[in-house]
């Protein structure tokens, strides 16, 4: 089981033949992965995946990521037939942190998230650096650098209220069918996570030398313009680094774009997705330079 686990999602992100070379003795990062060259000795690269459909239809921009992350091909568009890998990892290692996982998306739409327990329980992503900061380092954050903190009586009351419904819950579960019981279990799992969060907020955190509460990010726009998405990505990534250092979470997911890759340059109507379909291949370079 990993100590920390995270995913970055960038749909339609690599041009075949321009990301990784064919060497077998070590990873050979090419033009589109030059930024990773300094870390070549610390990275394992996996590619050329294939997703057996088991007789099910291939739903474009959906089947691929679902099958890769759940090991099961979906039957219907929008179907997520099993938990994504990060959810299983979070179940194993995320129980003793304030947040079982942190999910972020750079598109401005919280539903552009690729982590879910099932079709009906998809984890929404934080869309702005300021919202992410408020969640991680705002109300409820216990700074390891400060000692002598006292339990918040409001938090203690919230925890006691949650604990007080357990008997009613158990009686109610005995009256419903298996499908409804499964849905209720998902709901009460989230309640248990909240109870854990409240309990941790009443404890003085262990000293963490690398933990430094960051500054509040500047207010800014969200959306699908590439410069906006990049700026929000960089700001949220910096907050994420400190969230991990402060042991606020051990599992995270970052979505740079949506499954259709709808990012676009300022002042243009063509999205990245449209360019991959319609832009001509440059005969000199062998790829679509704008895409």
Q: Predicted regions: what is each one?
A:
Residues 1-291:
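Ligand-binding pockets and gating/stacking loops
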């Amino acid at each position: 089981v990993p100590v920390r686990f995270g995913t970055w999602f960038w749909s339609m992100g690599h041009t075949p033949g321009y990301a990784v070379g064919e060497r077998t003795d070590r990873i050979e990062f090419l033009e589109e992965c030059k930024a990773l060259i300094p870390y070549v000795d610390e990275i394992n690269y996996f590619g050329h995946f294939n997703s057996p459909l088991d007789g099910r239809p291939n739903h474009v921009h959906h089947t691929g990521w679902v099958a890769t992350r759940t090991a099961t091909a979906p039957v219907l568009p929008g179907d997520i037939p099993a938990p994504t890998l990060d959810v299983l990892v979070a179940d194993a290692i995320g129980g003793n942190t304030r947040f079982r996982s942190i999910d972020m998306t750079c598109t401005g739409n919280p539903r552009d998230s690729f982590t879910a327990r099932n079709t009906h329980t998809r984890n929404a992503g934080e869309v702005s650096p300021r919202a992410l900061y408020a969640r991680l380092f705002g109300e409820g954050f216990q700074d390891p650098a400060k000692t002598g903190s006292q339990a918040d009586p409001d938090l203690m009351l919230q925890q006691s209220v949650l604990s007080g419904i357990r008997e009613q819950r158990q009686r109610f579960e005995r009256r419903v069918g298996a499908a409804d019981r499964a849905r209720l279990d998902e709901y009460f799992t989230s309640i248990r996570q909240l109870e854990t969060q409240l309990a941790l907020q009443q404890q003085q955190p262990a000293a963490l030398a690398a933990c430094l509460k960051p500054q509040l990010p500047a207010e800014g726009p969200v959306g699908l313009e590439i410069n906006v998405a990049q700026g929000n990505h960089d700001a949220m990534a910096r907050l994420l680094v400190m969230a991990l250092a402060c042991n606020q979470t051990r599992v995270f997911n970052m979505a740079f774009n949506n499954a259709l890759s709808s990012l676009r340059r300022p002042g243009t109507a063509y999205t990245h997705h449209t360019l991959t379909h319609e832009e001509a291949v440059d005969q000199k370079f062998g790829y679509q330079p704008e895409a």
